[in-house]
């Protein structure tokens, strides 16, 4: 990746569901981005997504020319014609070519992405789980995310499209289904113009070390001692209670 290349991006038909008289001091209950369009000059690529409250609803695969829903269930309630996205991207490409010819271009500032890896649910050995690689603060939106298992590349992972943020950077999430084992470790590999070299974010299951026989013996002995002390203390209190209450039963009027 060459960080010196020029990247320009545009957004058309970007709608934010907020109050008509709103301002920065008014917080919206829900925010939706309809038709976020991005086209980049480094290659024939672009992005078209719909988002709601920061979550992707769908994106349009510009190569396959089809709508890809974040959850298949969404397609049962509504639909979207990908031709609209293709027309928007074509318009962006045309306008970008004009702008680059008529203006002095400056290279975009490359941000260093922030990478976090965690499991979807608590790890239990032998139980299927999902690893999540959360890549934040992406700009420009050009990135390659892959997974390594024990140092070797693996396939079968999925990822979201670029999700927009208020600071005009992006985030992207990659998912890898795996079977936890104490013999395996994983790395999320991120390549981006803001990095001098590929970044590997390491993850391996945190399995409590088994107690040694000596530790088990000590724990059992302590438990037994505590139990015996409790019995002795309880017996002493019972005897004292009987003694203090005994004479009162023999007292009477003369």
Curated annotation (Swiss-Prot):
Keywords: Adaptive immunity, Disulfide bond, Glycoprotein, Immunity, Membrane, MHC II, Signal, Transmembrane, Transmembrane helix. Residues 113-204 form the Ig-like C1-type domain. Residues 121-203 are annotated as: Alpha-2. Residues 204-216 are annotated as: Connecting peptide. Disulfide bonds join 133-188. This is SLA class II histocompatibility antigen, DQ haplotype C alpha chain. It comes from Sus scrofa (Pig). It is a single-pass type I membrane protein. Residues 1-23 form the signal peptide. GO terms for biological process: adaptive immune response; antigen processing and presentation of exogenous peptide antigen via MHC class II; peptide antigen assembly with MHC class II protein complex; positive regulation of immune response; positive regulation of T cell activation.
């Amino acid at each position: 990746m060459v960080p010196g290349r020029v990247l320009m991006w545009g957004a058309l038909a970007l709608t934010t569901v907020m109050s008509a008289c709103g301002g920065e001091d008014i917080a919206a209950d829900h925010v939706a981005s309809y038709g976020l369009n991005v086209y980049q000059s480094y290659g024939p690529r672009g992005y078209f997504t719909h988002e709601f409250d920061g979550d992707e609803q769908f994106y349009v695969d510009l190569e396959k020319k089809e709508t890809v829903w974040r959850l298949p269930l969404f397609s049962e309630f509504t639909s979207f014609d990908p031709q609209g996205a293709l027309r928007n991207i074509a318009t962006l490409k045309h306008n970008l070519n004009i702008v680059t010819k008529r203006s002095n271009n400056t290279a975009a500032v490359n941000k260093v992405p922030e990478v976090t890896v965690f499991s979807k649910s608590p790890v239990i050995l032998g139980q299927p789980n999902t690893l999540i690689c959360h890549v934040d603060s992406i700009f420009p939106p050009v990135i390659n995310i892959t997974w390594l298992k024990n140092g070797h590349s693996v396939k079968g992972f999925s990822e979201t499209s670029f999700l927009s943020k208020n600071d005009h950077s992006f985030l992207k999430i990659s998912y890898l289904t795996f079977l936890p084992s104490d013999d395996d470790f994983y790395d999320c590999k991120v390549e981006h113009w803001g990095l001098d070299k590929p970044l590997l974010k390491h993850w391996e299951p945190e399995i409590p070390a088994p107690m040694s026989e000596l530790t088990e013996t000590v724990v059992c002995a302590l438990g037994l001692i505590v139990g015996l002390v409790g019995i002795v203390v309880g017996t002493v209190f019972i005897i004292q209670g009987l003694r203090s209450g005994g004479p009162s039963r023999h007292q009477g009027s003369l």
